[in-house]
Swiss-Prot record:
Enzyme class, first EC level, given as a word: transferase
CC annotations in GO: cytosol
Disulfide pattern: none
Residues given in the record as dUMP binding sites: 132-133, 178-181, 189, 219-221
Protein name: Thymidylate synthase
Domain of life: Bacteria
Binding site for (6R)-5,10-methylene-5,6,7,8-tetrahydrofolate: 181, 278
Annotated compartments: Cytoplasm
Gene that encodes it: thyA
InterPro entries: Thymidate_synth/dCMP_Mease (IPR045097), Thymidate_synth/dCMP_Mease_dom (IPR023451), Thymidate_synth/dCMP_Mease_sf (IPR036926), Thymidylate_synthase (IPR000398), Thymidylate_synthase_AS (IPR020940)
Complexes and interactors: Homodimer.
Organism, as annotated: Lactococcus lactis subsp. cremoris (strain SK11)
Matching Pfam families: Thymidylat_synt (PF00303)
Coiled coil: none
GO MF term (any one): thymidylate synthase activity
Length: 279
């Protein structure tokens, strides 16, 4: 069993055994019912990417390619226009959060563009990678007041470098997430930001180091317990999947494409499970 599968099962068991139920939840299911969840707070895990510890479970298929396309919509295209996500990348699951003007509001990619977040990050890392201020922050109250829309879940990422004994510079990343759907989105979000970490490392010809993942509220929705128990019963694949970015060192961040990523040795357990999303 991979490290990621161990973490996946431990998190599920922890929520089932020690979690508490939310009250007066904001999200709703498609039938209009309130979508409460069982949750724990303060979940933290470290993945040593240098050692091949990638945060992807093999207990069910995870749509990594779509996740990476969504990431590029946010950080390369820098827009919240759903037409770009749907027509350029063929990713359609954000439609439920459309606010009426064809966007998801002044959120995510629109915030990245408004504050030139990626430009400032790359400039800061180029000037002084050892500076402890290389941060992405999508939690902008001004944007929340400007339009309606879902508030960012994965909202802050911090980057640090280390020069190891081999003389190479390694890029570490820390993702902070306010809320995470353990069964549906946990490994999607983690792998998205590992991909972002890899893109930035390639831009500077650095190695990829460690990925630190903190979730403030880690939950299982109250209509997902059957799926949770099924996942706990499954035997994980013996393969150890890893994500590879097949571009030369020094490739510009904005020149990297979704097809440059390759998920190697990924043989997830099937069949896929179905989930009714909370909106």
């Amino acid at each position: 069993m991979t490290y990621a599968d161990q973490v996946f099962k431990q998190n599920i068991q922890n929520i089932l055994d020690n979690g508490v139920f939310s009250e007066n939840a904001r999200p709703k299911y498609k039938d209009g019912q309130m979508a409460n969840s069982k949750y724990v707070t303060g979940s933290f895990v470290t993945y040593d990417l240098q050692k091949g510890e990638f945060p992807i479970t093999t207990l069910r298929p995870i749509p990594i390619k779509s996740a990476i396309k969504e990431l590029m919509w946010i950080y390369q295209d820098q827009t919240s226009e759903l037409s770009v996500l749907e027509e350029k990348y063929g990713v359609k699951y954000w439609g439920e959060w459309r606010i009426g003007d064809g966007t998801i509001g002044q959120r995510y990619g629109a915030t990245v563009k408004k504050y030139n977040i990626i430009g400032k990050l790359l400039e800061g890392l180029a000037k002084n990678p050892w500076n402890r201020r290389n941060i992405i922050n999508l939690w902008q109250y001004e944007d929340f007041e400007e339009t309606e829309g879902l508030l960012p879940c994965a909202f802050q990422t911090m980057f640090d470098v280390r020069r190891e004994k081999d003389g190479q510079i390694y890029l570490d990343a820390t993702l902070i997430q306010r809320s995470n759907d353990m069964l549906v989105a946990h490994h999607i979000n983690a792998m998205q930001y590992v991909a972002l970490q890899m893109m930035i490392a390639k831009h500077f010809s650095w190695k990829v180091g460690k990925f630190f993942y903190f979730v403030n509220n880690l939950h299982i929705y109250d209509n997902q317990f059957e799926q949770a128990n099924e996942l706990m019963k499954r035997t994980a694949s013996e393969k150890e999947p890893r994500l590879v970015l097949n571009v030369p060192d020094g490739t510009n961040f904005f020149d990297i494409k979704p097809e440059d990523f390759e998920l190697v040795d990924y043989e997830p357990v099937k069949p896929q499970l179905k989930f009714d999303l909370a909106i």
